[in-house]
């Protein structure tokens, strides 16, 4: 029920995603998909791709539409947001956007207390360590899923086991890497028409280089399909190059919870969607919870999705919300009969988040006004009527009014349009059940 277009729209326009999307490298989309295609080909044909086949896949991925890459990046950022501890999310955004010096960003550990792993594609059978994903996503470094041992955390990192701050992660370079880099530099210098500077140009020095180049070609075979120049070029290209397909970064200025204005000195905001992550995280520590793909291929079918994290665990199971929130949903402009009747995606999002954000006014419209993040542990939803995060993808069937005491026991998996309006009808056997009925 969480895979509706309206729900995905809210995921894609979350302030966390809006602020980080311009800093994601477009190369990450090509790299993750290329590794998945190679793995799928090997499983199907029991042999590796040829260079021509792999090069064709690479060219296909590089020429993909920008909106496809941005949609993938938005979903992956939403997935990563769940795995970052709530108290570290704001620091992570500010450090990536350059508004704050880099500090440790701790992730939620798995059941063994180690770094979690997630899948980066729909219905993927390979999982990647979170720190590897961060390095590929924000630095554009082509790392394999088995390169976790090559990552080295910075000395100022207070928790090297769980820190996923990209600025605290370096890739260790071995002697072989330096050896290969020497020949790459020499070959580029020989092919360049400009005179060589900084390197001896005597004939006695050039002869050994020619011999070494021959030995290099005999000793090493390039397994990838990226040239050096192409690899550097694509790894520096951001996934957002100007105006995106569904929104403009200029239009988002002033509506983000994470202020993109460098002159802003402080932030006062609330994150109601993150308040329940700390209380629910102990339930999902295994690797199976990382792979949140459904049979249809959507990411956010689990109860840990960003749009559903503002409800408690009983509502995640039963698909219901409190009467107060339902009353506010009825008053909300988002509660339209159909997605076609609603406003465009950007205007819907900005109107949706405007009551929550008080970056420019300096006033936090929250039950707990504070300059720092506040994560209540006693209650996930406010006890009074509120307009925080009304979930427009969840509506009651017409035959259930907002005051029906049994609405939390009714499954919303069925299409509400199939229900016939009429007076409330109660079944005799179902009020005693504590789990939803899926028939």
UniProtKB/Swiss-Prot annotation:
Keyword tags: Activator, DNA replication, DNA-binding, Nucleus, Transcription, Transcription regulation
SMART domains in the cross-refs: DWA
Any single Gene Ontology cellular-component annotation: nucleus
Top-level taxon of origin: Eukaryota
GO biological process: DNA replication; positive regulation of DNA-templated transcription; regulation of transcription by RNA polymerase II
GO molecular function: DNA-binding transcription factor activity, RNA polymerase II-specific; RNA polymerase II cis-regulatory region sequence-specific DNA binding
Name by which UniProt lists this protein: Nuclear factor 1 C-type
The species this protein was found in: Gallus gallus (Chicken)
Gene: NFIC
